[in-house]
Amino acid sequence: MKSKRRHSGRDVNGILLLDKPKNFSSNQVLQKVKSLFAARRAGHTGALDPLATGMLPICLGEATKFSPFLLNADKRYRVTAYLGHKTETSDAEGSVINKREITFTQPQLEEALEKFRGPILQIPSMYSALKHQGRPLYEYARQGVTLDREARRITVFDLQCLRWEGHELELEIHCSKGTYIRTIVDDLGEVLGCGAYVSDLRRLQVADYTHDSMVTLEKLEELTLKNNTLGSAIDLLLLPIESTALHLPEVNLESGAAACIKQGQPVSFFDNPTDTMVRLTEGGERHFIGIGIIDAHGRIAPKRLLRNVSDAL
């Protein structure tokens, strides 16, 4: 009889807003953070390309249960596009496949940007991690294979031009989940008639998490070296798990109803919004216990629950 494999590490729970450095994959920095915290479980909430920097929320322990809510959240980016060149990958890593002169004017730029605001359809790049028959598209692209990709509906809530100087165009983009910034830049370059690729990309925000709360790998390593007690300093950098759900309406449950929810049983609750997800808290101290769904009849069913109340702290 085979023994069950046990994961090593400690039970540490919370969310770290990592400022991902350039030239590292999201998985590489995830493993580094997991090691520094000596965490049993860890996961990130939406990969950034190696050339990109900025916010990469790392979920530790029980927080991994709530990572889908961040994966599906809106995001904000600052991107620098290099105009006049088109590359095979739509970023600086790819070979230049086309060069054209920059002939558009400022009014034409504003007109072009307007085409990318609001709900739009976007065809993902072949150099993306979307999968076809179990393989990421970029593997096909590297073999010279181009596949038909279905256009996907995304929303660009805000798109602002911050700077245009010669070949460089700096934009800030607030967009829905599933938006490929490289594709926006590539498509914009075609609308402008000169081609463009991403030369620099930084993620500023995920959901309601803002860039001023980010922590660098260097800071984590420095605190780890200065403190002998495992996790004593870096644990203070973790945000509570409840922060993933602060945008949801709260339903505060008395202990009896909370006990039913924790056992997976729906409870009836009146005077609350229906057909929506809610943040569930318990008792007068309003301890976070998880996320629930209220149906059209006012019944609350659990969707994601913490293992116990102390995990929210």
UniProtKB/Swiss-Prot annotation:
Q: Which superkingdom heads the taxonomic lineage of this protein's source?
A: Bacteria
Q: What is its EC number?
A: 5.4.99.25
Active site residues per record: D49
The entry marks the following residues as binding substrate, namely H44, Y77, Y180, L201
Q: Where are the transmembrane segments?
A: none
Q: Which reaction does it catalyse?
A: uridine(55) in tRNA = pseudouridine(55) in tRNA
Q: Which InterPro entries match?
A: PsdUridine_synth_cat_dom_sf, PsdUridine_synth_N, PUA-like_sf, PUA_sf, tRNA_psdUridine_synth_TruB, tRNA_sdUridine_synth_fam1_C, TruB_C
Q: Could you list this entry's UniProt keywords, alphabetically sorted.
A: Isomerase, tRNA processing
GO terms (molecular function) for this protein are:
RNA binding; tRNA pseudouridine(55) synthase activity
Q: List the disulfide bonds.
A: none
Q: Name one Pfam family in it.
A: TruB_N
Q: Which GO terms describe its biological process?
A: mRNA pseudouridine synthesis; tRNA pseudouridine synthesis
PANTHER family attached to this UniProt entry = PSEUDOURIDYLATE SYNTHASE TRUB1, TRNA-PSEUDOURIDINE SYNTHASE
UniProt-listed HAMAP family: TruB_bact (MF_01080)
What NCBIfam families is this protein classified in? TruB
Please give the name of this protein: tRNA pseudouridine synthase B
- Gene designation per UniProt: truB
